Swiss-Prot record:
It comes from the Archaea. This is Tryptophan--tRNA ligase. NCBIfam families: PRK12285.1-2, trpS. GO terms for biological process: tryptophanyl-tRNA aminoacylation.
Amino acid sequence: MAAERLDPWGAVEIKDYDRLLRTFGIRPFSEVLPLLRKAGMEPSFLMRRGIIFGHRDFDKILEAKARGERVAVLTGFMPSGKFHFGHKLTVDQLIYLQKNGFKVFVAIADAEAFAVRRIGREEAVRIAVEEYIANMIALGLDPKDTEFYFQTNRGTPYFRLIQLFSGKVTAAEMEAIYGELTPAKMMASLTQAADILHVQLDEYGGYRHVVVPVGADQDPHLRLTRDLADRMAGVVELERPASTYHKLQPGLDGRKMSSSRPDSTIFLTDPPEVARNKLFRALTGGRATAEEQRRLGGVPEVCSVYHMDLYHLMPDDGEVKHIYTSCRLGKILCGECKQIAWEKLERFLAEHQSRLEKAKTIAWKLVEPPRF
């Protein structure tokens, strides 16, 4: 974390999550686990395993829910590439919260895709609908209780917030949070703040208790948004949003997972033979020889195949613990471990892709694409 900053647009690799908690004032998620049950919610395996490791004010959201007040969750996706397992990690959290009574809002960051990534408008719309929205529906997000929207189509009150926010923060303050910024990134940051806060307006449902689940690298946007909510007092009353933070799933090459490096991730639309080849070439924590691994054991902490099990393929805690222990004790070799993961991945992809074409048809009916 150079100069104690996180870059939400860059290839951030975070090694020390405890330091991140200390540096940026994020609270450990473990402290809200008892409150989940009071709110009638069983912790998900992502929560139990510490993959969701931190929060800001999520305890207040749970207390509001326990009082019977309306709660919502909002996230956004920039349509700049194919939908991969890193994206699925966020959607799994949306599905969990939706099943527990949260209204879901999903922003399609088409303005940011154009300004920051230079994605053509028509291409951004196609990617948004056929890759992101369709995959979310196929994963199990209920479209009847989800509001999808394009940033550039959202309406006057939303854009009014962006304009007013621009008068509540200086360029120097934004650079202290983000580092050097282009005009496009400044605009994208203010727009993301509007995404997070606008659902509190009556025109968009008046949801005062909102949580935003993000990867740890996205925290700068939350810090800016919380400051802006405070500074809008006297203009429009906005509550600080809550947030939860998940660890970034390593790519198959050990670096940050990215659509721009196709071999670093498995896309949810990959044909079986492509997905299998990627998985079997993935970085592992194995030793140089089978004999050495049996003697010394493997290192699952740096194994991208184990991370696929941990984050996605093995919701049963006992099963994933067995894989971890067997690797550590040298009782299982990498080839066998990959085969176990592949059998689960193959089944998941087959079932998911069988739902995808129908989901695409539904997805096009859910949103109004921007005219230009």
